[in-house]
Amino acid sequence: MVDALNLGRRLRVRSTAYVASELVPFFWPMRNFISRNPLRRLESMPFEQAVRRGAALFHARMFLPRGDYQRWRREGKVRPETLDEEIGRRSQDLPPVPGVDWPRWLHALMQTPHDRDAVVRGVRAKDVHAALRGHPPSAQAVDVAALLPELEQRLHARTLPEAVDALWGTGLADELDDLVIKSYLDFFDEDQSAWRMPGRERGLFSAWSEVTRRNARMVLRRLHVRHILDHVQDAESAVVYVMEEMGIGAEAWPTYFTRVLTRLHGWTGFVRWRASAKHYYWAQQYPADIVDLLAIRLVMGLALLQESARHRGTPMRRDDLGAVVRERGAECVLRYALHSGEVLPDWAQRIDDTLSRGNGARCHDLLQRYWPLWQARLGQQQAAALRELAAAANATAALDALAPEDVEGLLQGLRDFAPQEGMVWTLAMEGQAIDKLLTQVQAPQDPPPDKRPFAQALFCIDVRAEPIRRHLERVGNYQTFGIAGFFGVPVGFLGYGKGSESHYCPAVITPKNLVLELPAALDPHNEDFVSTLGHVLHDLKKSVLSPYVTVEAVGMLFGLDLFGKTLAPLGYSRWRRRIDTEKPVTRLLVDKLSREQADSIIRTLQRAMIVKALHTELKIERERVDSGIIRELREIALRRRDGPTRLRTTFGVPQTQETEFIDKLRQVYGVDADYTNHQLERLGRIGYSLDEQVNYVHTALTMIGLTQTFSRFVLVVGHGGKTENNPYESALDCGACGGASGIVNARVFAQMANKAAVRERLAAMGITIPEDTWFMPALHVTTTDAIELFDLDLLPPRHLVYLERLRNSLRAASRLTAAERMPKLLPEAKALEPAEALRLANRLAVDWAQVRPEWGLSGNVYGIVGRRALTENSDLQGSAFLLSYDWRCDPRGRLLENLLTGPVVVGQWINLEYFFSTVDNSRLGSGSKVYHNVSGRFGVMTGSLSDLRTGLPMQTVMREGRPYHEPMRLIALIEAPLDFAGRVLERVVKVKSLVLGGWIRAIVIDPTQGYKPFVFNNGQWEERTPLIAPAEKEYSA
């Protein structure tokens, strides 16, 4: 066994592993899908540099194939001027080549109809020159030593199992993936599987080690994992032992760890998040961190290397591998060619036969004959590509005149431009999108201050709100606003019947306050309320099914679900809702508890625990105990008085047993002074103080510019999706609410805003809300386009006469939105009437066979921070996050700071989640839903074993194999004076970095300069033509 690690070495292992893993972004559980930029940990770099680093890190492509951009160019979605500007600018950095007009050649390259690389990998300029001249292949002897540095570099960039695979085709890395994924599933399972790894409470590595030592499957597989584990004590020592056994020095650990942890980046991201989520129940019960993950993979990798060394003679140390390459160079070159697929088809069998004989001289002879033919073939392929390119550039004569050294310059220039081409296309698409936006926005006009809209509505900034806002405004006298869907109120929520707290706020925020959902029949001032709340706080159990429902009955019901939701989804859904138990009308406990209420709750809870303890420990039933004995036991347990108790005189309990019972009350049942203080702290989280409520409502209303002319109805509209058989259902919910429905936050905010005490304080702060204004929570169901109203039983009677008019308008907006949305899902739906389109939307939402009930946020490209009047006359086709903001209400820029650091940054995460899920759906997205399996109730895998799929499914961003989402970076438009916006950006370091680094494209529309737009491009603000003023709008009562 190795010596125990000292503190310094232990910290070095942990710190190196943590730094290596930080390149992988967090991955949240699927039930709360959180959009994130897959390259978020590279945001300190300029975007164009980051995508190159990301391509190498995740082995993914960062831009689409050329053909997709060419199609969009034909459709007018690519700005030609930007193409010319970018090609011209980048041509200046390419090596000068006689007779080569780089802009002309690059334009020709971007117009070629295929997507293959412009330069063939591994080609030599002299072979290309010979092929262009029609000369035969070189007869010069192959210098094997000259081929080895590149081979060694390629092998060094891999982990040791991957390097062995590259030379021997052993498949160790794939087998290693399967082995560790099985272990991860057994440990991280959240009660989905019938079997879970024992001993999980000790931590991942400890539990895995114990199970693996007894795993017969490992013995049958001839993996001596137990022998390795006998040499280590914990995860840190395992890492050190394996790295030493593989001959990898500490200076190489950071790069090696990064390669190990990014191979299954979904699992790495999940473990990183889980280890940081202190509130997460499963992490509290069964801890795991990135060092555990790393150690398991290293130990299993070493076991596979040892097994391969015993049976195949492959090396198991990095230095041994290097020695093999140097000593058996010709053999290794041939091995790499064969197993990488970079081999002439006619020679593959011949190479394989020679390698199987293991004769070094034969390998050397074969390489001397094969390698010139291989290089000649590459030269011929490259020459053909250059001739095609030269013909397109009308430069055939220039190509024919190139000397060998000029051919090398041409190839180098094409190599240099290759990773830039996707960026050029993206910039040109963004340029066209910016031009399009600036033709749609108009100089805003404020509505007359004395004209009161029939209703106002606060919607989430989500792009799916744009169509229904537009239609609602056009069916009647409605005014809409955009605000982050948690309405600025972070909510910790304990729902009715739920067993754990959920967070309804952006993922980067941890709520301080807890809101309870309780049946409306409970009165906060009576004993039933106190008793129920005490039970909720003590024993947070989730009742899924009543105990008397048999497994067989559940199975039959599920069978009915599968049948009904697939063959007759809409009718079945209605029937199922009728037989399901109705959730009672509920209220949210939003106000802080008084000290008297908190004391009463704890007192009731402690009395209940004493009764339970009497029954469990002393077999004394409740009916034999009066309240005096319970009160006496409680006082003694809390050390407020001394014994003895009536347990001795009434029940004959011996003194020693009585003492033991009192100790158990304190230590086991929580009837203790210290635990009472802890419970008081927990109860202190419940609800919001009046000051907090005033602050939240004031900030939200001021931020969106709703400070006067309040309507009779102010709808607070959260949003969420309702689908069936969809592991990605939470991806359709509100990102600002932590991947959950926004109705909880809407109800909380409305309850605050309707409170008389809050309004009284707001009036003193300059915001007077009329007595007849009622804030009403609602839910925009994005999969059905419906807007559902909540808490109608609280609606003042005088508002009931207007309710039907409101509902009619909402229904009309829903039908019009469905008629706009359905043809995007199903082209054959173009001819549907609005009412038919709405019925179709409802059917798709409950159809188990439907893999795409909506497009989600596909098409998002704009983030508009300003008054709604900028865009209210524009059809933005669901492409814009609309954030209401009035700079005139924000003299110090604090509100704009909050918008930039919150919603704009979250919008950028969402935007880049869609961007990268589109450009490489297999690596950065999650592939097709058809092959998805829910794993452990926290993630999705492709098939039975794979990396956790972290991005968006193919059906969300692709249609019929082509991109539906058009990948562009977020274009953020701010309505504010340029100098004012500039000062705010300077203060918000994170957003300033994103703008300067090109992660966000910025536009400022300056109302003090005649609404002149300024576009940030290449490090400076470029002026554009001022906006036009809209036609005069009529306002009806």
Swiss-Prot record:
Q: Provide the protein's localization.
A: Cell inner membrane
Q: Which cofactor does it need?
A: Zn(2+)
Which InterPro entries did the record assign? Answer: DabA (IPR018752)
Task: Give the residues the record marks as binding Zn(2+).
Answer: 460, 462, 719, 734
Q: Which UniProt keywords apply?
A: Cell inner membrane, Cell membrane, Membrane, Metal-binding, Transport, Zinc
- GO MF terms held by the record: zinc ion binding
Gene Ontology CC: plasma membrane
Bilayer topology annotation: Peripheral membrane protein
**Matches recorded under PANTHER family:** INORGANIC CARBON TRANSPORTER SUBUNIT DABA-RELATED (PTHR38344:SF1), UPF0753 PROTEIN AQ_863 (PTHR38344)
Which family does the record claim for this protein? Answer: Belongs to the inorganic carbon transporter (TC 9.A.2) DabA family.
- Please describe the quaternary structure of this protein: Forms a complex with DabB.
What this protein is reported to do is described as: Part of an energy-coupled inorganic carbon pump.
Q: What is this protein called?
A: Probable inorganic carbon transporter subunit DabA 2
